[in-house]
């Protein structure tokens, strides 16, 4: 059993903003460009807002121009679940956090080829950023090694 578990619906409603709840629990999409992490390129990790599980690392984040944080890959592909999404008259691949089943965003195959060709377009409202300097203090010491040689 993972140490990162989704909270109850009541706890999520109490601790998340309405936007965070709607994005993660109801698969809504936050507005582009004016969200919290679109322009954040500080060193650190991005964790699931509902469970605290590390999902993305700042060294895999890139400027995509899409209006949402974009990553070339997750920290570990086993932390992410992909689902076919046919909503809004489009066919896309929805990205969810595997342990918490929280909606994160979508993945597209139009990312930079030198980074693997994928673009994980993720809602800021589904994430919490942990600055590198605070990772150990906040319980993410096991992920500091990911920044070596980067």
Curated annotation (Swiss-Prot):
It catalyses: L-methionyl-[protein] + [thioredoxin]-disulfide + H2O = L-methionyl-(R)-S-oxide-[protein] + [thioredoxin]-dithiol. It comes from the Bacteria. Its EC number is 1.8.4.12. InterPro entries: Met_Sox_Rdtase_MsrB, Met_Sox_Rdtase_MsrB_dom, Mss4-like_sf. Residues 9-132 form the MsrB domain. One of its GO terms (cellular component) is cytoplasm. GO terms for biological process: protein repair; response to oxidative stress. PROSITE patterns: MSRB. Transmembrane segments: none annotated. The keyword DNA-binding does not apply. GO terms for molecular function: peptide-methionine (R)-S-oxide reductase activity. Keywords: Oxidoreductase. The active site is at 121 (nucleophile). Belongs to the MsrB Met sulfoxide reductase family. This is Peptide methionine sulfoxide reductase MsrB. It comes from Mycoplasma genitalium (strain ATCC 33530 / DSM 19775 / NCTC 10195 / G37) (Mycoplasmoides genitalium). The lineage of its organism: Bacteria, Bacillati, Mycoplasmatota, Mycoplasmoidales, Mycoplasmoidaceae.
């Amino acid at each position: 059993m993972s140490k990162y578990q989704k909270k109850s619906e009541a706890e999520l409603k109490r601790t998340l903003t309405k936007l965070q709840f709607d994005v993660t629990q109801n698969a809504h999409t936050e507005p582009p460009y004016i969200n919290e992490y679109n322009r954040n390129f500080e060193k650190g990790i991005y964790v699931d807002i509902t469970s605290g599980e590390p999902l993305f690392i700042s060294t895999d984040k890139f400027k995509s121009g899409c209006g949402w944080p974009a990553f070339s890959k997750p920290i570990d592909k086993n932390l992410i679940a992909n689902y076919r999404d046919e909503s809004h008259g489009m066919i896309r691949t929805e990205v969810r956090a595997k342990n918490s089943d929280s909606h994160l965003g979508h993945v597209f195959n139009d990312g930079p080829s030198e980074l693997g060709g994928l673009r994980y377009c993720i809602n800021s409202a589904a994430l919490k950023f942990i600055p590198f300097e605070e990772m150990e203090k906040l319980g993410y010491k096991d992920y500091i090694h990911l920044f070596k040689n980067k």
